[in-house]
Swiss-Prot record:
One of its GO terms (molecular function) is electron transfer activity. It holds the Pfam family Cytochrome_CBB3. InterPro entries: Cyt_c-like_dom, Cyt_c-like_dom_sf. Monoheme c-type cytochrome. The gene is nirC. The keyword DNA damage does not apply. It is found in: Periplasm. This is Cytochrome c55X. The lineage of its organism: Bacteria, Pseudomonadati, Pseudomonadota, Alphaproteobacteria, Rhodobacterales.
Amino acid sequence: MARLALLLVLLAGTAVAGPPDAARQDELRHLVRQDCGSCHGLRMTGGLGRPITAAALAGRDVEDLSDVILDGMPGTAMPGWRPLLTEDDARWIADYLLKTETE
């Protein structure tokens, strides 16, 4: 019985959360500007990291980009953000980058 209770608690934490709410989206936009921008440039046009503008990412898949966000890129300075972001957060950021034009 204790095992079943533990399993139910663990599964409850893995339920599909869905897209981030408006407040979390604001936090993620801030993270993109501050944290991603520190390497990819304030306009995401490149710096230490490669450009991540919508134009530079054209043709990339949301799932592929979210995997890079979560797991980083071995052999580069790109860290994995899995300890801080959910998969839904990473997909939202990937979609945001693919659709947002920088000025």
